Design a protein with these regions (language model features):
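Bacterial N-terminal signal peptides that target proteins for export
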Residues: 1-9
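C-terminal catalytic region of ATP-dependent kinase domains
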Residues: 27-59, 63-67, 298-446
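Low-complexity, highly charged intrinsically disordered N-terminal segments
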Residues: 64, 68-113
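Conserved ATP-binding subdomain of kinase catalytic cores across diverse folds
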Residues: 114-251
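Sec/Tat-exported extracytoplasmic proteins
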Residues: 145-147, 178-179, 278, 438-445
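Conserved kinase catalytic-core segment
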Residues: 163-168, 249-340, 344-348
Length: 446
């Protein structure tokens, strides 16, 4: 045998012997055969309300459109997979998310009820107005019914009957079934005499200064809302959330002072994976102000407090934004989109765009919401301000798409039924369109 071959043989023998001798010192296997985590322990006591500053709306859009887009590009960060998943790449239950339709079959009645806990305030008039908010054409009153339950009353903008109130109800039910924490909402019909102003009711002027709410303020506000010929007013009543409001959750980082909030929000699967369901319902108005963190008391232990995370304000879904603004690009381009402007300039406006074929169906209660131009993978919100969606990858989108595909026609129909649309054709159109958009989501997997 050649010397080289002899050396190799002896080396192999030595390695084998060494491996056998050290077998007893090898570390244990890293992965154990045990159940995947299904519930996150994020309800540990937070003795006092956490801090955190919610940015002004102008500041927020400046950050999203300009500063963070530039700084994020300069950071040259590699793509990072989402956190907050278990060994099966699924999202456990937490203060952010609760698995519902993704893990069990919900009955149509469950979807129709959504987040209902105390029930509709209809039949519990008069409503005592405690405060009002009026921003532009958006009108809202915080009022209590005769049970003492407090609701935010929101209305349809004059000239757009049933669209915004129906969208709030339908999308809220679908998002609740998907797994998100949302407020309890109901459609209520009332009359002007059902609204009573409390002696200490307040409002704010254009400069944000608080003052007493007057009858004149209420009359002026109601002139901007849709009122039926018989004097009835259609209202979306959203029950005020329990606890102390902390403002919306930031799109990046964590909330200061909340020890349970450990994962950067931009890397949470339940936030990044919302892309398919938001595209499905055309949830364009994504911003920090349309989420709300609440410092709550544990129902089973009054000495324990923690933060619950909610999404809210879905009235601009289901094509309302495109309908109200007359901007057919909504969902296909940002409201301010230099790239889209440049493309139009270079092509001299001659290139056909998919959104040019969009039309409202001409049905009461339905906005510009269709399936034939819907691109699930190309849909974008109104502004590039919500970081989790901007960073969503194919794994996040696949996770969300799987849950969207769990909805049956009967469950979707139950969500639409809760909106109490007066035209049966409108309800049928919305169900058909949501099913068609769902199938498009299935075809792309995102």
């Amino acid at each position: 045998m050649r010397p080289a071959a002899i050396s190799i043989a002896w080396a192999a023998i030595a390695l084998t012997a060494g491996a056998c001798a050290s077998h007893a010192t090898l570390p244990s296997v890293r992965f154990r055969n045990q159940p995947a985590v299904n519930v996150v322990d994020d309800r540990r006591d937070v003795p006092s309300p956490p801090g955190g500053r919610e940015p002004l709306i102008g500041e927020y859009y400046y950050e999203g459109y300009f500063r963070r887009r530039i700084s994020r590009a300069l950071e040259l960060r590699p793509a990072q997979r989402a956190l907050g998943v278990n060994a099966l790449d699924e999202v456990p239950d937490s203060t952010w998310f609760e698995n519902r339709i993704g893990v069990r079959d919900l009955s149509p009645d469950e979807v129709r009820a959504g987040a209902t806990r105390v029930g509709s305030p209809e039949g519990f008039a008069p409503f005592t107005i405690r405060s009002s908010k009026a921003a532009g054409r958006a009108v809202g009153f915080v009022a209590t019914d005769t049970r003492g339950e407090k609701f935010l009353l929101k209305f349809d903008v004059r000239g757009f009957p049933e669209i915004e109130t129906a969208a709030e109800i339908i999308s809220g039910r679908l998002l609740w079934a998907f797994g998100y924490h949302v407020p309890e909402t109901h459609i209520v019909y009332l009359r002007r005499e059902d609204l009573v102003i409390a002696p200490d009711a307040t409002t704010k002027d254009e400069l944000g200064r608080k003052r007493r709410l007057t009858e004149r303020d209420v009359r002026r506000a109601l002139r901007m809302v849709e009122i039926e010929p018989d004097g009835r007013i259609r209202v979306m009543a959203s029950r005020m959330l329990d606890g102390k409001p902390l403002g919306g959750h930031p799109g990046e980082g964590t909330r200061p002072g909340d020890p349970n909030d450990r994962l950067p929000h931009e890397r949470r699967r339940e936030l990044r994976g919302a892309y398919p369901v938001f595209a499905w319902i055309d949830h364009l108005d994504l911003k920090i102000q349309n989420s709300l963190d609440m410092w709550v008391t544990d129902p089973a232990n009054p000495d324990c407090h923690y933060v619950m995370h909610y999404f809210l304000d879905f009235g601009k879904t289901l094509g309302w934004m495109g309908m109200h603004s007359g901007d057919l690009r909504r969902g296909y381009a940002y409201t301010f989109d230099p790239g889209d402007v440049l493309e139009s300039f270079v092509s001299a406006g001659l290139e056909a765009r998919p959104w040019e074929a969009r039309r409202a169906p001409g049905l009461r209660g339905v906005g510009i919401f269709d399936a034939h131009t819907f691109d699930p993978a190309g849909w974008i919100p109104a502004a590039p301000v919500y970081a989790p969606l901007l960073l969503a990858d194919r794994f996040d989108r696949f996770w969300g798409a799987k849950i969207v595909m769990r909805f049956t026609r009967a469950q979707i129909g139950a969500a639409v039924d809760a909106a109490r649309l007066t035209d049966p054709r409108a309800a049928a159109y919305l169900v058909d369109t949501l099913v068609a958009r769902q199938r498009a989501t299935d075809a792309t997997g995102s």
